[in-house]
C-alpha cells in the first residue's frame, strides 16, 4: 500500500510539471510570434520607403541614418524577411534576411544576413534602433558610408569616400574592358559590369567578409555565383583602392579586363574548371592586344625558370591562395596565362575558347581537363604539360 501511494504522488507531480510546460509553451510562443509579426511589418514599411525614396516614411520606422547612405543606389527590389526575434525588456533583437536587386543588372536577388535592434515608443510601436551585418556576414558598401554612383556606357560604379571624378575613371576602365572581352569571348553574356569601390583595403575586406591580409596586394576581385544561372545576381568587381592605386595605366586596364572576363565566363565556370584555366584565360584576355611579352608579363615565373628550370606541372588550385607567398601566387597566375597563351598560339583562339567551355561542360573536376584536351586539342594532359614546359624554356629561359 505504501508503495502504491508513492506512485500516485509522483504521477501527480509529473502531471503538474507537464501542465506547467504546456501552459508556458502556449502562453510564450504566441507572444513571440506576435512580436515577430509586428517587427516584420515595421521592416516591410522600411523597405517600401527605400524603394519609394521616401525619407520621411523611412524615418518613421526608426533610425534614419541608413537612408541617406543608400539613397543613390538604383534599386529594383529591397525587402526583409525576419528569421528570428528575441524580445527582452522594452526592446528586441531580430535576425533577418535582406534581399535586394540593383536595377538593370541583377536578374536575381542578392541576399545577406542582417542583425537588428528594435525599441518600443511610448505608444507601443516598434522602431528600428540599429541595423548592421549579422556576425560572419560582409559589410555592404552602404554600411561603410554614403554611396556615390556613376554610370558608364557598360558599367555601374558604386563607391564610398570617392568623388564623381574618381569613380568616373573606374567606369571608363570598365567601359573599355567590356568590348575588349566581347571581342575575345563573344557577346553571349550580359556585357555590363557592376563595380564596387570601397574607401580602402579594410573596406574591401569588410565587404567580402574576410581579413584584410587576404587581399593585400590584390588590385581587384570578382564575386559571383558559380555557374551563373538565369536567376543569379550580377557579379561584382570589387576594387582594392590601395593596391589599384599603385598600378600604371596599362596595369589598371589589364586588371579591369581580367575581372570583366570573369563576369563574361561565369556561366561556363564551375567546379570542373581549374584555377590555372579560369585565371590564366582572364589574364590572356587582359593582356591581349597590349603587346606585352612573356618576359614583361611573367617576371616571377621567368626568375624561377632561369633559376631552377620550368615547374614540373601546371599550377594547382592551392598555388592561387591569396594568404600565402606572394611570389608563388604570381607564378601561378603567370603559369596559367602562359598555358592559355600557348593554346591560342598553337591551336588557335577559337580552340582556346572551346577548350574552356568543354572543361566547364564536364561539371566536375575529375577528368574534365583530360577529356577536354583530348576532344578539343587532340592531346593528353601529360603531353600538353611537356609542351608547356618547353614553351616556358623557350620564352623565359
Predicted features by range, described:
Residues 30-34, 40, 44-91:
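Short solvent-exposed beta->alpha transition segments
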